[in-house]
């Protein structure tokens, strides 16, 4: 069994520089956070979980069928937020402004994944880039200040060029996301 998800790889130099600064900031270090390595940055479209390796070819076909007419585009990373709520945060994330060019393909893929038994229910797409998983909060003031200061901060643009089937593997060096299949979007 492989732990799989479908997502969009993301690179942002502005977000990387701020994440490095925040992770080195004494105030934020009072809170226990596991920072996501920049090489693992992505927007999750669908989390599939434990999946037999024999199903990968089917997933490749479903992804290809769903996204074959979608063109590459640029979108913007805006604002810092937390899941599930500010009072009990578990995830620190950046918002993604607009994935509208691929929403129809996303919905089609969701329908195909459900029809083929990969997903049980439809979940709304909340496009975001996870910066850190919050283990515990010892200084809620520092986190609140960060959220207030960066709630509408423009982190710049990112190119959306491919949809990727990832395998998530836990190693002694941390979690690694290995691309198993990439569907490149059409050149704009």
Regions found by a protein language model. Give the residues of each.
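Histidine-dependent nucleotide/RNA phosphoesterase domain, centered on the 2H-phosphoesterase fold
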Residues: 1-188
